[in-house]
Amino acid sequence: MESRYQPTAIEEKWQQTWAEVGIDQTPTDRSKPKFYALSMFPYPSGNLHMGHVRNYTITDVIARVRRMQGYRVLHPMGWDAFGLPAENAAIKRGIHPAKWTADNITQMRSELKRLGLSYDWNCELATCSPDYYRWTQWIFLQFYQAGLAYQKEAAVNWDPIDQTVLANEQVDSEGRSWRSGAKVERKLLRQWFLKITDYAEELLQDLDQLTGWPEKVRKLQANWIGKSTGAYLEFPIVGRDEKISVYTTRPDTVYGVSYVVLAPEHPLTLQVTTKKQLKAVKSFIQEVTAASEIERTAEDQPKRGIATGGKAINPFTGAEIPIWIADYVLYEYGTGAVMGVPAHDSRDFKFAQTYQLPIRQVIIPPDPDLNEQPILQEAYTEPGLLINSGEFDGMPSTDAKAAIVAKAEATGWGQARVQYRLRDWLISRQRYWGAPIPVIHCPQCGIVPVPEADLPVVLPDDVQFSGRGPSPLAQLESWVKVNCPTCNTPARRETDTMDTFIDSSWYYLRYPDAQNDQQVFDPAKTNDWLPVDQYVGGIEHAILHLLYSRFFTKVLRDRGLLNFDEPFQRLLTQGMVQGLTYTNPNRSDSSRYIPSNLVDPNDPKDPETGEPLEVSYQTMSKSKYNGVAPEEVINKYGADTARMFILFKAPPEKDLEWDDADVEGQFRFLNRVWRLVTQYPVIEPTTKQGDALAKEEKELRRAIHTAIKEITADLGEEYQLNTAVSELMKLSNALTDASCKDSVIYTEGIETLLLLLAPFAPHISEELWQQLGHTTSVHQQSWPQVDPSALIVDEITIVIQILGKTRGTIQVPASSSREELEEYARQTPVAQRYLEGKTIKKVIVVPGKLVNFVVADA
């Protein structure tokens, strides 16, 4: 046998062999239960990082274990390949996005294969391939036919550098683009939306089904959907026929309304403004609407407003109240107008103080001293009793909500309403590298969907990338001009492409039938494999990707393609991989991070200034100079060591701190396993199966089956992979220390160790399995089954105490009675020595643990 563990040679050998025999291909035999294991697919940026390695290794262990446990497993991989970085690369480097993306996919696929990940590459897909986005466009048409895709003019976040629309999530707290850093502007454009709000209630209610998801993720989605119960209330405008409609969750405070506020974009803003205020109001609106939504609503930003001079009437009090315009009110939310109740809303309180507006208290604490009502120093937002509220005085505020809404409905002043924070999904992007929206704009027919027979609408290759002006598609007249498929008159293609979240909202449905060129997928195949049994990915996708995927699943179900409600049964959100980070707090933000190769870890100082550095663990990134390239680790230690460290260092859901010493530790462990097997005696065992086992054989077999029991439990539904690796180490130690290496039990132990190790370190396990003389792959073996009888303990260790102090131990039969335990203890040399000449006052026996002699001096 090979005497040295040489991971590079072993790993290359087995990766090639596995590929040649197709060991990881998805089985078609439906007699076995199915298991769909899926990692969130990556954006092909060019190189794997340790976050990728962690995600994919976790999922790979799960897939490998389930195969050995008798499941037919689908474990695919693909590429979320559309997006801005490819187009930006085209602008900066003069390379076409398609080539940049294809080159990156080739590089990353090679790196994934080096990790020994058991993907069925026959299922591979890339969202930028016409073979894929043909069906993305087909799905868009399904939404359009169902009335779930529509176009309207909307205020959007506009990145003036990247020249594209940004989702709110792509704008930081300072109102800057997440990618270019440009100050985001507000701009009106005709945009395409998907009507996710039609599914808001179902998306909320079905969260209760997702018991296999982290509670944190479910709460994040529930908060994002943001269901609230309240009322629409109407405030007539003085001197006009119109009314201002507001939505409120606090109708119990309506008697405290001292002003109403309109969004700058509200259609009534100029109509309610007096001539005296008109110029100032127009200037204010122009200034405010240029700011991003994030800037306007940020908690730490002062709220700005302007009086219109107009008045409205509070129908409940009959009082005239001023109409204001403020930056924090957004037209896209609710009605685009809010009622100002400064006494009972913190934001309104600050606004009223700033602009010296009346503060009218209408709720007091439940047990107040009614004769003493001090001037409010802050808004009172808790439940209480109503005051200054007419017929509702003295009523608990929780009861007053329903009573006041009932009055509003009876008088025509308003009505009860359920509302959601969730808004329809804006999917238009003014970029090239995305799936074209399959729509034609005809001057005669209006919006005309591209016929299904004409799909895909393929991205043209002959485009120019300047990074300025309209999107490259809009500038290519030869592509834009087309005849209307309905009336044949000259028309124009839609030049917007789809948000890349569209591509990732259905990719998991395509994997079971990835090569199908006749339909989006065969419903029989997809309904057989779905829902995904275990989905693994980062917590950063808790809201958008996961919510959109749930939305797509429900729509395609309603279109008759799917027979399930939710796409992902279980979700594991793995923690971040963190690296040792050196920071000089006295430097500017752009240069505060110091590369680790320039720092002495024993005396961390700034190499230029000599200032002491702050040392911490932070998420690995290029900008922090704290990353570790997977390729470097694999080249030095092998993929199996990289996998073992990633799995051992921390529980999957927790952040992982990179530690070179622990990587070395895992390499040493695999070397011990290598020596353990390669030095395994080839002599015929002296004991046979069925022979009475000696004590040391029983102990070893107990260790073997304890490992099976514990590791199987760790790999159940909670995936405590770090403790599973610890159990592997315990078993290897037991085998190393065993004195019965010529026993059939030792043979069982060696083989069991390799079977249990195989999902974690697949290459070394396969090599050693073959060296033991097996001709079929270790990965095609059945998962070891625990023998309960092997766990039965024949002997136990009992502690002997004198006056509560431990003086020794004794091995006794596990079935010993109290009387027998006392007698065994009395007969030991240690007890006889300490009891000589003493009077035994009492004997305390704790079965399974100890015998304590309480003595007095003679």
Swiss-Prot record:
Q: State the reactions this protein catalyses.
A: tRNA(Leu) + L-leucine + ATP = L-leucyl-tRNA(Leu) + AMP + diphosphate
Task: Give the UniProt entry's GO cellular component terms.
Answer: cytosol
- Classification via Pfam families: Anticodon_1 (PF08264), tRNA-synt_1 (PF00133), tRNA-synt_1_2 (PF13603), tRNA-synt_1g (PF09334)
For bias type Polar residues, the affected ranges are 584-594
Q: Please state the Enzyme Commission number of this protein.
A: 6.1.1.4
Chain location of the short sequence motif 'KMSKS' region per the record: 619-623
Tell me what this protein is called.
Leucine--tRNA ligase
